[in-house]
């Protein structure tokens, strides 16, 4: 009988961290799984390590081939997955012993969920920057499918190595290379297709922060590529019915998002600013208005492009008091 759960684990030159990663998988309280490990043409001892583990534990299936990159490795491995659910894992991370069991319980109990993530602890802690600590706090504040949707255009609200997805859904979408992060792309496609993504609100993954991590070295993870990804999905989603929208915020993030949305034929009809010196002026042809003027322009979708969590909280509250509904009338996008 095939296990209910497949674990999809790509590996490239991961020999230093792979043994501890695999041990954390073997120590799961949920014992019935099969792990498809894809060696993406490693030049170190990754393949030897995998074959040694697979020789002792037949729950591991090793797939090897020439180096083709992460997206191809993920799709190659996905084709070998047979479980009803597919859990992602990276070769330099560690699972809490109850991760698989807790996520499996939630997916089995909530048929409406297509996928679930969990909270994380970023490590090693010694050299963790203030920015990474803030990102960890933000990730771990997201505790429901509703919150995943609300935060989806701020940053990726689920750490991808924590994701467990119904295989039928993942096979339908697959992974793709659009020049921006493949994990963020998948999450936004899940949501755009109407799927709900839940969260087990427990720290069930130790997420390694290292200078060699793909998110630090790949051009696909550059800030402008995240912005391009957000713009593409905003243009085909909330902003699809019209060519114009209201942009709240014209700082660095707002300016970058406006430029990215122009590539999709979307331009701001108005720009909301609190800066008194800008009120009544034009920015690239768009009048600058105060928040109090927004009810006069009801019907135009609103994109709140403000970087700070507290300012976003205040703006959400203000829009709610004016009768605007988040996700229907406005979204926040950093």
Residue ranges and their predicted role:
Residues 23-32:
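Short, acidic, metal-binding catalytic loop of nucleotide-sugar glycosyltransferases
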Residues 98-133:
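Conserved donor NDP-sugar-binding/catalytic core segment of glycosyltransferases
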Residues 65-81, 102:
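Glycine-rich, basic loop-to-helix element that forms the pyrophosphate-binding segment
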Residues 86:
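Short aromatic/hydrophobic "clamp" motif used to bind/position activated sugar donors
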Residues 7, 79, 135, 141-218:
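Conserved nucleotide-sugar donor-binding catalytic segment
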Residues 39-48, 90:
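A conserved acidic beta->alpha catalytic loop
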